[in-house]
């Protein structure tokens, strides 16, 4: 039981998301992220939003609008074979036995994937007033997050 708890804690602490961005024109980009199964779809979306803000700033823009998105759940759960244990007693001409089944551990694998299409704006450009501020998304320590890059661990 302690081993399973330790494995669960290790998975939770090692829950990471990675991402990449591809410029499709001077002011548009496609951002894709993949988050560990334990992060869920919300973790993948949060990673996409952070990556979008980071890449918007790196591209020299201030704000962005998400114009399209897609998500995919590739998480699978498998169970390893279990084991049977039979214990019995014999005495006075009778036999009594009890068989118990211990299920095998479950293995969670796969990822939650997220893709976003964005249009980026400079401050003051037409359409920028409706766009999300990249620095606002990242918070007060946005410079450090832009420097750190696209690999996140939650």
Label the model's feature ranges.
Residues 1-10:
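Sec-dependent signal peptide recognition
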Residues 12-15:
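C-terminal motif of bacterial Sec signal peptides marking the signal peptidase cleavage site
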Residues 17-154:
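Secreted/extracellular ectodomain signature
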């Amino acid at each position: 039981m302690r081993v399973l708890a330790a494995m669960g804690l290790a998975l939770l602490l090692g829950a990471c998301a990675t991402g990449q961005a591809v410029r499709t024109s001077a002011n548009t980009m496609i951002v894709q992220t993949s988050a560990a199964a334990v992060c869920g779809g919300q973790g993948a979306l949060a990673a996409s939003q952070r990556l979008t803000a980071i890449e918007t700033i790196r591209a020299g823009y201030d704000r962005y609008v998400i114009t399209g998105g897609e998500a995919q759940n590739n998480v699978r759960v498998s169970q390893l074979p279990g084991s049977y244990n039979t214990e019995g007693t014999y005495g006075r001409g009778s036999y009594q036995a009890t068989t118990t089944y211990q299920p095998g551990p479950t293995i969670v694998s796969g990822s939650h994937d997220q893709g976003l299409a964005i249009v980026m704006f400079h401050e003051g450009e037409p359409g920028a007033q409706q766009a999300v501020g990249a620095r606002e998304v990242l918070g007060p320590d946005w410079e450090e997050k832009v420097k750190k890059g696209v690999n996140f661990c939650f």
